Amino acid sequence: MTVTGNDGKKYTVDGSKSITLRPTWDELEQRVAKASNSLGSGNAASAQKLVELADIKLSWDIDEGFRQCPAFAGTDDGDNKALTKSETFGFYCPATPNVIYGNRSMPDWNMTYAPAAGVRHELSHHAIHMRCGTIEPEAIMQNGVNRTEGVTNSYAVKYMGANRALIQQSIDYAASTGHKQYRMDAFTDRAAERIHSGQCNAG
């Protein structure tokens, strides 16, 4: 085929040798946000397909995730208790950015929560990582308090198609067991908006 270059000249191109470019993160994010929660036979299978839509792999070896990112696993932060392994649905490790780790022993994988909220939260950690180069950019800090999980929930609801009611149920349950870091509010919503627009610094 013949194409015209920026210089106005005509060039002949062999179309049979063309390549398909990997979608941008914006394209992948929109693909996930628009996707149904019923992509496979059952909730766990649907959640896995949702992760794959983002060009990421779902691994059931959550211990490997903890080995790859020990600093992000099981660390209490002030009044916010860290989740134990038996409480952990999934895990995103920045050292292995193309993998979401799932804890298959959690019953939530068999519920609508898995595709509608759980994996969309984990994919939002990846989204923030892609946009800011870290899962904890300055934008998530509120008066010296790390709001990573709350901002990630807000991002999941605003940009990844997460079900707000199911996210809120998980927030309420987590808070009842001492894990208050997942709550959403006006700050986390604003921070998610800023991060989505590429503003990763403190606002």
Residue ranges of predicted features:
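Solvent-exposed, acidic/flexible segments
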Residues: 25-28, 32, 81, 108-117, ...
